[in-house]
Amino acid sequence: MSGDEQSIYMVYYKNMIIFLLLFIAHCLADYYLQRHSWIMDKVARHERSVGLLYHMLTHVLLTGATLFWLVGFNGSWFMLWIWILIIGTHYLIDIWKTYQTFTLPYYLADQIGHIVVLILATYLLINSHALPDSTYTFLLEHQAIIIWSAALVFLANPMAITIMVILMPLREKMHQKDTSIAVS
């Protein structure tokens, strides 16, 4: 691998590790720390929901902690703008989702929207040169832990919920057949 290829590879790799850290924070807040009662409150009250407020506070704390850990506070307000971008768009996407039915297309649109924002935030962070060299060194030294953590966090609860949403129409059809058999 030439020097240019290696440098392109390292930039890509750093981007992926930073994205994975933001993705872990997102998954923890969306799938592990969000209570069912908050979800039901969001569906019932939409943007006036206390559940939405609690959910957003969870994202504020986890995303903020992740960004602060990555960038630190070096006097730059750029991190604050990234934080506002992630939290603000998450809030808007979640409000939009409360007005939709809980079906696969809307579920996927919701999660893809969040992931696109995290990719954009990663891109902006990398190109801002706000991340200190010590952060890059740490990320590269602990890359395996970060990758495995992201895989475990994603494959446990988020994947189970995704499979449940995929299978919901089939389950409803099976339930309808069971009911029609019992009535006959």
Language-model region placement:
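Alpha-helical transmembrane segments and their membrane-interface exit regions
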Residues: C27-A29, L85-I95
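Interhelical loop and helix-boundary elements at the membrane-water interface
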Residues: Y31-M56, I93-L118, L140, W148-S184
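Low-complexity, intrinsically disordered short segments enriched for Gly/Pro and polybasic residues
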Residues: M1-M10, C27, G88
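N-terminal signal-anchor module of multipass membrane proteins
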Residues: Y13-H36
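Alpha-helical transmembrane segments in multi-pass membrane proteins
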Residues: L21, A25-H26, L85-I86, A121, ...
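Helix-coil boundary and interhelical linker segments in multi-pass alpha-helical membrane proteins
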Residues: D4-L20, T63-W81, T122-I147
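Transmembrane helix-loop-helix hairpins at the membrane interface
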Residues: L20, A25, D41-N74, V183-S184
